[in-house]
Amino acid sequence: MIGTNVAPRHENWLQVVKSYYQLTKPRIIPLLLITTAAAMWIASEGRVDLFTLFITLIGGTLAAAAAQVMNCIYDRDIDYEMLRTRARPIPSGRVQSRHAFIFAVILAILSFSLFALFVNLLSGLLAMSGIVFYMLVYTHLLKRNSPQNIVIGGAAGSIPPLVGWAAVTGDLGWAPWILFAIIFLWTPPHFWALALMIKDDYAQVNVPMMPVVEGEESTVRQIWWYTLLMIPCTFLLVYPLGVSGAVYGGIAIILGAMFIQKAWQLKQAPFDQVLARSLFKFSIFYLMLLCTAMVIDSLPLTHQVMVALGDNLNLLLSLIPLN
């Protein structure tokens, strides 16, 4: 039986808006949009159409919000059981499940309509596939049944760069799939670091997250190996694909070294909550800066500066006597 708290009615429309806004889990969405925007800048070689960018980000926001609302509906039983999530709109009784479902459907329809009308059909279909995969594969099939839930389910969170690339080009080449792979491999270290901190919550409601099923030591070993897989993947954009250059590559090296250091520290002390929290926070910082580096590297001005620096370096080298 699914329980809810008896909450007082909303006293005004502002409280209603606040409750529905909370259903969308808004803190999760910006990171998805950053990866979308980075893909668009790379695909357009730094000359992204601002209208297309705006519509794509709005459509992506609506799609992500729809997925999160549906997730809140599905997880209302375990949200009620956990003190940390009991105050959410549905388990607290502030929003009824049927109303939340209607809200989610409206968000999804608006998202697809924006993509189909103002961008292209492929980007809209990809956005909808993210919702379907997140709900059917991650939330329904995997989350409560497999410790690999966020590994496979992480594909849903890796779709935004595909949407962004398709919005610009109308198709998908190798580069967007590398972006997909980067986020896919980034997800386990990011999410398992969080799971290490709230392991008891998941255990309380019988959700088989990796730390609950395999323990901290096994979890941090897997965090370590996924980190080692992810970092080299980030350099594939530079070589062999050549869609990003030296600026991005240099920043990726620095960020990658920092990520490896933090993952190694956690591997050495798997029960240290402070290190787990540090890795979790850094993983967010890492992805944001990596995507920012992609954008900066793609700009025509950056290319001009790098060419000028290369020419000056060649000139200096030519002045050095060979013997």
Swiss-Prot record:
Keywords for the protein's UniProt record, in alphabetical order: Cell inner membrane, Cell membrane, Heme biosynthesis, Membrane, Transferase, Transmembrane, Transmembrane helix
Source domain of life is: Bacteria
Which pathway does it take part in? Porphyrin-containing compound metabolism; heme O biosynthesis; heme O from protoheme: step 1/1
Q: Which reaction does it catalyse?
A: heme b + (2E,6E)-farnesyl diphosphate + H2O = Fe(II)-heme o + diphosphate
Query: What residue ranges are annotated as transmembrane?
Result: 28-48, 50-70, 101-121, 122-142, 150-170, 178-198, 235-255, 282-302
> Which cell locations does it reside in?
Cell inner membrane
- Class of enzymatic activity (EC top level): transferase
**What molecular function does GO assign, one term?**
protoheme IX farnesyltransferase activity
Query: A Pfam family in this protein?
Result: UbiA
How does the record classify its membrane topology?
A: Multi-pass membrane protein
Biological process (GO), any one: heme O biosynthetic process
Q: What is its main location?
A: membrane
Cellular component, GO, one term: plasma membrane
Q: What else is known?
A: Carbon 2 of the heme B porphyrin ring is defined according to the Fischer nomenclature.
Family of this protein: Belongs to the UbiA prenyltransferase family. Protoheme IX farnesyltransferase subfamily.
For this protein, the record's PANTHER family field holds: 4-HYDROXYBENZOATE SOLANESYLTRANSFERASE (PTHR43448:SF7), PROTOHEME IX FARNESYLTRANSFERASE, MITOCHONDRIAL (PTHR43448)
What the protein does comes down to: Converts heme B (protoheme IX) to heme O by substitution of the vinyl group on carbon 2 of heme B porphyrin ring with a hydroxyethyl farnesyl side group.
Q: By what name is this protein known?
A: Protoheme IX farnesyltransferase
What organism does the UniProt record list as the source? Rippkaea orientalis (strain PCC 8801 / RF-1)
Q: What is the lineage of its organism?
A: Bacteria, Bacillati, Cyanobacteriota, Cyanophyceae, Oscillatoriophycideae
